[in-house]
Structure formats: C-alpha cells, structure tokens
Swiss-Prot record:
Protein name stated in the entry: Riboflavin transporter RibU
UniProt keyword annotation of Phosphoprotein present: no
Coarse class of the protein's main subcellular location: membrane
Keywords: Cell membrane, Membrane, Transmembrane, Transmembrane helix, Transport, Virulence
GO CC field: plasma membrane
Stated family: Belongs to the prokaryotic riboflavin transporter (P-RFT) (TC 2.A.87) family.
Protein species of origin: Listeria monocytogenes serovar 1/2a (strain ATCC BAA-679 / EGD-e)
Places the protein is found: Cell membrane
Residue intervals passing through the bilayer: 8-28, 43-63, 83-103, 117-137, 154-174
Keyword presence, Transmembrane: yes
Length: 203
C-alpha cells in the first residue's frame, strides 16, 4: 500500500462507494431463486484493477461489502452474505485482471471475462455447498431438509453463470468506450506492466 498515492486511495474509495450503490440496485434474476440477485457492483472493481492493480480490486470489493453490512445489516447477525459476495467478486475480477495482463487484446478481454465467470461459478458452488447453505440451515434461515446439492445445481450454478455473462457483456461495452481513458489514467506501475507486455507480444 505504501506505493499508493492519496489520489489513488481517494479514487479507490470512490469506486468502492460506486460499487456499493450499484449493489443496492440489485434485482432477482431467476424466478425459481428470487433470493439470488444480480447487480453490477463488480464493474467498478474491474475498472479499479485496470487502473491501479490487484490491490484496488480487493479494496473496492471490501469497501462495498463493509458499507452494505453497515447500512443493511444481516438477517443472521453476521456478514455471511457479504463474505460470499466478497469471495465471488475476487474470483471473478482477479482472474480477469491477471489473464488480461498476458493477453492484452479485445479477444483477450473476452476470454478473460469468460474464465472469470467460470472460476466465480465454481468458487461459489463450493462455498455455498460447504459453508453458506449449511450455515443458513443451522441458523434456521433455510429448512433443515433443504436439498443443498439440488440448490447448487439448479440455482447457484445457473445464477452465477448468467450473472457472469450479463456483467461481462456490460463491462465489455463500457471497456470499449473507456479503453483510452483507462490507459491514460493508469498508475505508472500498471502502465509499465502494459508497455512491457506489449513489447513481449510484439517480439
């Protein structure tokens, strides 16, 4: 963090706040699972990563979930849902950041978002199966006879795949318009990474 300037910290805080606002605008995606809601709060984290690096991704995801917990609380008393969203965001955004670092093209960005979607879906299936759903069942948030495997297969996995596709499509549209602006406003460290990788690709 010592390499982050005050300007970068302020920018990350703004992106985190924007992510929180977008998260508050969530809406159900699958009629069969109305408790699973889509939002576009990972897009500011993606932009933050491209501008300032992977630490910005973590901070934006953290800020939005801390703000959400402060404002909305949790029906079970502990921020389990916020933890799930934090993990989901990291497994989606960080793979995109790191893979795009090597591919550096429009096709590379499309592939990166596809990989991020698959990794996020897998991570959330595992987290829900072993942690989140058993926790909710234990606290009475779900019936004791809930078929966790069925819920994972027919709700959690389809939801996260659809979420990844929709969020990726919106981000790719934004990225096509913001690409030059992002390149102009990147930190020097991220710009050097980009230039170094461009030289490697050209050779």
């Amino acid at each position: 963090m010592k390499n982050y300037s005050m300007k970068v910290f302020v920018s990350v805080a703004v992106l985190g706040t924007l992510a929180f606002i977008l998260m508050m605008l969530q809406f159900p995606l699958l009629p069969s699972a109305p408790f699973l809601k889509l939002d576009f709060s990972d897009i500011p984290a993606l932009i933050g990563g491209l501008l300032f690096g992977p630490l910005a991704v973590i901070l934006v995801e953290l800020i939005k979930n801390v703000l959400l917990y402060i404002v909305s609380g949790s029906p079970v008393g502990v921020p389990v849902g916020e933890l799930a969203n934090f993990i989901s965001g990291l497994f989606y955004v960080l793979p995109i950041y790191y893979l795009f670092h090597w591919l550096r093209s429009t096709k590379g960005m499309v592939l990166s978002t596809a990989v991020g979607t698959v990794l996020m879906t897998g991570a959330m299936a595992v987290f829900n199966y072993f942690v989140l759903l058993p926790f909710y069942i234990k606290l009475g948030g779900l019936p004791a006879n809930t078929d966790v495997a069925w819920l994972i297969t027919y709700a959690i996995v389809p939801f996260n795949l659809l979420k990844g596709v929709i969020v990726s499509a919106v981000f790719l549209l934004l990225y096509s318009r913001l690409k030059k602006w992002i390149a102009k406003n990147q930190t020097m460290k991220e710009r050097r990474k980009f230039e170094k990788r461009q030289q490697e690709i050209s050779h």
